[in-house]
């Protein structure tokens, strides 16, 4: 029961984090948009780099990219909280039911990991050379979230068996 509760609480912690991320992106829209704007504009990368042709100067496309991130985060948040409810309902049920209840949280955490990996580490850091920026480099935060969510996903993936602590 303790192991199941730990899995549930860790999932709830990530769901809370995502709720706050969405809240911040919506209520402090411009500050967070500026991050996306500058990464896509590539205006703080190394002078003279040969990747500047990748930059997206269109504010409309930058806004669309930012909205897609927020939409991804909202979808992930909904799945995370849905997963919390599913695990909570299955907390005292047989191990097979608890294991089955993990499907939604596994999808949610995978969606989360894909966002941090694809949107920030692959597209932002590598394609738009975010790693070159002293001001708009979100690699450390993205990797931190990727690692935390991944660790919790690995914990959740451990099968539950009858009689486990």
Predicted regions: what is each one?
Residues 3-35:
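N-terminal signal-anchor transmembrane alpha helix
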């Amino acid at each position: 029961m303790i192991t199941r509760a730990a899995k549930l609480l860790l999932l709830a912690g990530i769901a809370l984090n995502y709720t706050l991320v969405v809240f911040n992106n919506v209520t402090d829209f411009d500050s967070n948009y500026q991050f996306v704007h500058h990464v896509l504009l590539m205006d703080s990368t190394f002078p003279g780099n040969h990747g500047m042709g990748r930059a997206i100067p269109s504010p409309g496309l930058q806004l669309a990219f930012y909205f897609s991130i927020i939409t991804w985060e909202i979808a992930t948040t909904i799945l995370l909280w849905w997963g919390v409810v599913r695990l909570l309902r299955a907390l005292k049920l047989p191990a097979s039911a608890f294991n089955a209840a993990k499907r939604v949280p596994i999808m949610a955490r995978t969606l989360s990991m894909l966002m941090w990996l694809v949107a920030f580490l692959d597209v932002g850091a590598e394609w738009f050379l975010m790693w070159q920026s002293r001001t708009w480099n979100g690699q450390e935060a993205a990797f931190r979230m990727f690692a935390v969510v991944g660790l919790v996903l690995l914990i959740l993936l451990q099968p539950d068996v009858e009689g486990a602590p």
